[in-house]
């Protein structure tokens, strides 16, 4: 069943509960990257054009079910106000008298943003009573929060059973783009998977084996693979409990005819911080007392050749310790190589997107996915609760 679409629905004068993903990075009370806010604007502009009265809900960070000013949406609302032409109001509470009163006072095309839904533990518990209180604010539900679609929470799943429910434009685009990757990718299909832990990527790697032609591994997870092949990795991050599974993945790739590539050289550091001394080492391995912090120039060159000839590219996860300036080189090189490729390109995950933005090549990428965890779970072949709920009839 296809997702129910917004475009042909009459929403004039109706209150629309719009779940978005405004989970943006904030430093010293200021939003440092507004990409996720900007990505929802087409849906918001469509709702304004339709004369809807919009109630926006989002989570921000992990306040653990308690009100915590550090995770307030107030600074996000200030940025959001500068991106839309409509009147924007802010409710300092999620449920109760204030949001109900403000939602009833909205005029067509006006927007109310309610406070962080995760200030209530019932949100993450998907507690039915809390879902009902959210649903009481509106007549219609729209989910545009693909980044939270893998969570069965009250504002992403529970409420969808209580109101007529639709997919927002961003949600629909994400599902279409990622579905096409799995269904009919142009060949060769290259997946570039990085990040620190192999444990968090095992399922997606397993699901990709019968779909991709090349699998390029980077980031901290590469050292668990290398250790499983008896390559010296010094003090690098290794998940000992996953060495056997990493070795089995290498074997499985061989059987499936997938070209699985691991780093052949490394930028290493003598400590895990910005003050680390650094050097480059190749296939002899990493010395004791040193740790792998980024892929080396030979690895970059190997990966660039494969990327250049790709028909489809999926990238999730950095090639090194991207949060430290000394070790961003590999990730930045991959970002630039992908941007020069003629392939269809899909990028997901916070650090990968940050590298694309830092390299100023976002306009060269076919699709930048707003959901790190959600896009990975989708690529694992799993059903996303927030998406499945949109396909169901409203509870009587």
Swiss-Prot record:
**Keyword check for Lipid biosynthesis:** no
What top-level class of enzyme does the UniProt entry assign? Answer: transferase
- Can you tell me which residues bind ATP? 201, 292, 323, 349-352
Q: Which UniProt keywords apply?
A: ATP-binding, Cytoplasm, Glycolysis, Kinase, Nucleotide-binding, Transferase
Q: What Gene Ontology cellular-component terms does the record carry? A: cytosol
Q: Name one GO molecular function term.
A: ADP binding
The residues the record assigns to binding substrate are 21-23, 36, 59-62, 118, 151
Q: What is its EC number?
A: 2.7.2.3
The biological pathway it contributes to is: Carbohydrate degradation; glycolysis; pyruvate from D-glyceraldehyde 3-phosphate: step 2/5
Q: Which CDD domains match?
A: Phosphoglycerate_kinase
Instruction: Supply the Pfam families for this chain.
Output: PGK (PF00162)
Instruction: Tell me where it resides.
Output: Cytoplasm
GO terms (BP aspect): gluconeogenesis; glycolytic process
Could you tell me what reaction this enzyme catalyses? Answer: (2R)-3-phosphoglycerate + ATP = (2R)-3-phospho-glyceroyl phosphate + ADP
Q: Is the keyword Nucleotide-binding in the record?
A: yes
Q: Subunit comment for this entry?
A: Monomer.
Read off the HAMAP family from this record. Phosphoglyc_kinase
Family statement drawn from the similarity comment of this UniProt entry:
Belongs to the phosphoglycerate kinase family.
**Protein name, entry field:** Phosphoglycerate kinase
Organism encoding this protein: Leptospira borgpetersenii serovar Hardjo-bovis (strain L550)
């Amino acid at each position: 069943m296809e997702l129910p679409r917004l475009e042909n629905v009459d929403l004039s004068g109706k209150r629309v509960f719009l779940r978005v993903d405004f989970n943006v990075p904030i430093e010293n009370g200021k939003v440092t990257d507004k990409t996720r806010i900007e990505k929802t604007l087409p849906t918001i502009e469509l709702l304004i054009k339709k004369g809807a009265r919009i109630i926006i809900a989002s989570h921000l960070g992990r306040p653990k079910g308690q009100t915590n000013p550090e995770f307030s949406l107030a600074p996000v609302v200030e940025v959001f106000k500068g991106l839309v032409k409509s009147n924007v109001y802010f409710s300092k509470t999620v449920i109760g008298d204030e949001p109900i009163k403000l939602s009833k006072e909205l005029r067509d095309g006006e927007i109310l943003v309610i406070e962080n839904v995760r200030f209530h533990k019932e949100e993450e518990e998907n507690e039915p009573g809390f879902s009902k209180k959210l649903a009481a604010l509106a007549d219609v539900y729209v989910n545009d929060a693909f980044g939270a679609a893998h969570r069965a929470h009250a504002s992403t799943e529970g409420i969808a059973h209580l109101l007529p429910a639709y997919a927002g434009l961003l949600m629909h685009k994400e599902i279409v783009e990622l579905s096409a990757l799995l269904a009919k990718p142009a060949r060769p299909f290259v997946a570039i998977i990085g990040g620190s832990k192999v444990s968090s990527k095992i399922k997606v790697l397993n699901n990709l084996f019968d779909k991709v032609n090349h699998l390029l591994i980077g980031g901290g997870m590469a050292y668990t693979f290398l250790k499983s092949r008896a390559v010296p990795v010094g003090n690098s991050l290794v998940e000992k409990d996953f060495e056997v599974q990493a070795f089995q993945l290498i074997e499985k790739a061989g059987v499936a005819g997938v070209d699985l590539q691991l780093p052949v050289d490394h930028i290493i550091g003598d400590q895990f911080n910005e003050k680390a001394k650094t050097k480059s080492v190749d296939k002899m391995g990493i010395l004791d007392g040193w740790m792998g912090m980024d892929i080396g120039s030979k690895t970059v060159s190997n990966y660039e050749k494969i990327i250049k000839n790709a028909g489809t590219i999926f990238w999730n996860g950095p090639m090194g310790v991207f949060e430290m300036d000394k070790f961003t080189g590999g990730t930045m090189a991959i970002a630039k190589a992908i941007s020069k490729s003629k392939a269809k390109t899909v990028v997901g995950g916070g650090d990968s997107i940050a590298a694309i933005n830092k390299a100023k090549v976002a306009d060269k990428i076919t699709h930048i996915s707003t959901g790190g965890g959600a896009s990975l779970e989708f690529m694992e072949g799993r059903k996303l609760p927030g998406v499945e709920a949109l396909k169901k009839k409203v509870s009587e």
